[in-house]
């Protein structure tokens, strides 16, 4: 196999995000549902025989020289001893500093695609172990489904069968301004003692359950977040922030006119995915 083109890297929304504590090493403990969305970046992979990792921006958005895509490819080389290389073309559509997991999803799709392109035959669990060092959200994007996530992001329960999320459309708003995740988690006013919930609690009201504990801090640090939420609420929608922002979203329960949104905002109507588009590219370990 010489190439894999048009490989999707879907976004996620946090349907809720509760901070339940903080470890001695400073990492925050959370509970959340990460939901896959049909808004995605697209990656293209061409095998190289010289072992080099190269990357090309195809969308006009400047990318750092050592972003998560490159780091994921190098991590897979190092973990397996693979001597093959790759040239990666990136069509970047997902906004940065949005709380939608764009960089983490790119890294996960890179691991999945190179596992196939380089014929490594690693299992889903093996790739997730490699992904842990790339970022807390990367293992989720390898699990194959939307998921209930706990701990610092390492405890992942796919939402399948009886717990599968019902189909739903959403309006997603990304204000022009972004937010740095660390600035929110370091804020002295962040509440870190949310009571633990269960999947059964969440299942009683999939798209209305809980809250985002990071949202009050984000609204104070970046007023555009509150402005976007207020705009969606004025349309009689139930809006909240995803992740550490600055993107916000609301389930669509009616037809709405999006033309009144400020021109600098990125406004998009999306649907949830029933499974990751690359789910079947990985095999699960036998029990």
Swiss-Prot record:
Q: In which pathway does it act?
A: Isoprenoid biosynthesis; isopentenyl diphosphate biosynthesis via DXP pathway; isopentenyl diphosphate from 1-deoxy-D-xylulose 5-phosphate: step 3/6
Q: Which GO terms describe its molecular function?
A: 4-(cytidine 5'-diphospho)-2-C-methyl-D-erythritol kinase activity; ATP binding
Q: Per UniProt, what is one Pfam family of this protein?
A: GHMP_kinases_C
Keyword Oxidoreductase appears in the UniProt entry: no
Active-site residues from the entry: 12, 137
GO biological process per UniProt: isopentenyl diphosphate biosynthetic process, methylerythritol 4-phosphate pathway; terpenoid biosynthetic process
Give me the residues that bind ATP, please. Answer: 95-105
Q: What EC number(s) would the UniProt record show?
A: 2.7.1.148
Show the InterPro entries listed in the entry.
GHMP_kinase_C_dom (IPR013750), GHMP_kinase_C_sf (IPR036554), GHMP_kinase_N_dom (IPR006204), IspE (IPR004424), Ribosomal_Su5_D2-typ_SF (IPR020568), Ribsml_uS5_D2-typ_fold_subgr (IPR014721)
Record keywords, A-Z: ATP-binding, Isoprene biosynthesis, Kinase, Nucleotide-binding, Transferase
- Catalytic activity annotation: 4-CDP-2-C-methyl-D-erythritol + ATP = 4-CDP-2-C-methyl-D-erythritol 2-phosphate + ADP + H(+)
Name of protein: 4-diphosphocytidyl-2-C-methyl-D-erythritol kinase
Q: Which species is listed as the source?
A: Delftia acidovorans (strain DSM 14801 / SPH-1)
